[in-house]
């Protein structure tokens, strides 16, 4: 009898373990760049599951880059391998939308009713919209800032407490830093690889890539001409050499460059690489037209792919959590990305004290009102279009072409690549 009682007790325990206390929804989540985001995703998912025990988060194999990420998702569409949620580069949201892959979050935003109270202002929401459609929620966002070597600025007669606020001032001081000699260069501007930093100059002048109907190139208009003229002057007057991206970053971190212009997302690594070699400072990037200028937003957004009703509810909870104040409080300190949530930026419960204690991060934060979406070209030639622009920027930097010539050549080539209705 005692043996039977023990067996029954053991069976009862076994059944208690086997049967969940509540129904569980499992979400498969895909993300890119594990070097940046693995720890971030692990931290966010653990916190989310602790607060939502009926939802389990499991991760698909991450992609090395944004480009690999979008290609992976497009290959998996319509298969059992497609995840329920993905994190996609902001400039590739259009590809998902044009192929009708992403779930329209507009109805979920409307149903929620209080997104602004959760820190999702209209400005923040627009970062992950495509032609007014809410394709995702911005997760990790960045804007371009000015990094500067306060020691070199001071040596060249500048005031580190009052860094340049216009491109004319940057160029003049860069030239003076170059004149210090000893292998020192004035400026590094990350024009390589994509059109993001060209967008910073173009949007900063109040310009745009294409006409409103996207049928004609607009980046070679007056604003674009001003943008490439600044790039030209950075070289001819400001002491900017022909750096590769990596070489420019290394030279700046070694104390051999006065100013560096690139993403705030590189801030944590820059702080680490500079160490105690010099007095590192950051400031807002100048706008060619301060009254009407804007800045492109880099980074990625969380996108819902599942059309299963039960999973969509769970996915919406996770998307808001990841892109919300807690998620931002995990992403920002570990990377340098700016918060994509206004509640996180202002509240002492999240990042308010962080910015007070880490002033180098304030430049990117202060530029949030100027952020607009990183433009994505229509059609299937987006990658070719971007490379065409970069190739012609290279001609300006290496001085093998005049700014207007290179810009007009880029415009003519891009015009031929645009889709025809």
Where are these regions (language model features)?
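Glycine-centered hinge/linker elements that transmit conformational signals in sensory
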Residues: 171-178, 213-242
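Periplasmic solute-binding protein
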Residues: 93-101, 106, 123-162, 190-213, ...
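Mature extracytoplasmic/periplasmic domains
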Residues: 107-110, 249, 265-268, 288, ...
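Short, well-ordered beta-strand elements
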Residues: 24-35, 55-60, 84-85, 135, ...
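Extracytoplasmic/periplasmic substrate-binding proteins
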Residues: 197-200, 228-311
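Extracytoplasmic "Venus flytrap"/periplasmic binding protein-like
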Residues: 43, 47-120, 129, 155-157, ...
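Hinge/lid segment of periplasmic solute-binding proteins
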Residues: 90-143, 171, 201, 275, ...
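C-terminal capping/gating helix-and-loop segments adjacent to ligand/active sites or protein-protein/ligand interfaces
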Residues: 359-413
């Amino acid at each position: 009898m005692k043996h039977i009682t023990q067996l029954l007790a053991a069976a009862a325990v076994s059944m208690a373990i086997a049967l969940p206390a509540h129904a569980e929804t499992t979400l498969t989540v895909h993300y890119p760049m594990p070097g940046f985001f693995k720890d971030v995703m692990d931290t966010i998912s653990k916190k989310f599951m602790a607060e939502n025990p009926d939802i389990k988060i499991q991760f698909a194999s991450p992609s090395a880059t944004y480009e690999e990420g979008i290609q992976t998702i497009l290959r998996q569409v319509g298969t059992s391998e497609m995840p329920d949620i993905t994190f996609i580069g902001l400039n590739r949201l259009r590809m998902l939308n044009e192929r009708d892959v992403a779930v329209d979050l507009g109805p979920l935003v409307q149903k929620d009713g209080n997104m602004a109270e959760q820190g999702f202002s209209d400005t923040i929401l627009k970062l992950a919209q495509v032609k007014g459609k809410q394709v995702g929620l911005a997760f990790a966002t960045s804007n371009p800032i000015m990094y500067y070597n306060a020691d070199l600025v001071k040596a060249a007669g500048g005031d580190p407490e009052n860094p340049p606020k216009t491109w004319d001032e940057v160029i003049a001081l860069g030239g003076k830093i170059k004149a210090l000699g000893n292998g020192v260069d004035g400026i590094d501007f990350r024009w390589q690889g994509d059109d993001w930093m060209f967008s910073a100059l173009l949007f900063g002048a109040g310009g745009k890539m294409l006409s409103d109907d996207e049928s004609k190139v607009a980046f070679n208009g007056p604003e674009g001409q001003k943008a490439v003229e600044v790039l030209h002057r950075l070289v001819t007057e400001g002491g900017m050499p022909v750096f590769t991206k990596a070489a420019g970053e290394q030279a700046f971190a070694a104390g051999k460059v006065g100013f560096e212009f690139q993403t705030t997302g590189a801030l944590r690594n820059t702080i680490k690489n500079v160490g105690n070699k010099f007095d590192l400072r950051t400031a807002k990037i100048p706008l060619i037209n301060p009254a009407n200028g804007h800045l492109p937003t880099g980074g990625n957004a969380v996108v819902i792919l599942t059309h299963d009703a039960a999973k969509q509810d769970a996915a919406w909870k996770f998307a808001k959590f990841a892109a919300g104040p807690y998620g931002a409080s995990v992403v920002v300190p570990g990377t340098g990305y700016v918060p994509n949530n206004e509640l996180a930026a202002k509240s002492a419960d999240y990042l308010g004290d962080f910015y007070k204690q880490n002033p180098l991060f304030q430049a990117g934060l202060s530029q949030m009102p100027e952020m607009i979406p990183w433009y994505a070209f229509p059609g299937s030639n987006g990658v070719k279009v971007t490379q065409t622009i970069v190739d012609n920027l290279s001609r300006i930097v290496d001085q093998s072409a005049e700014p207007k010539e290179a810009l007009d050549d880029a415009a003519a080539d891009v015009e031929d690549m645009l889709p025809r209705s």
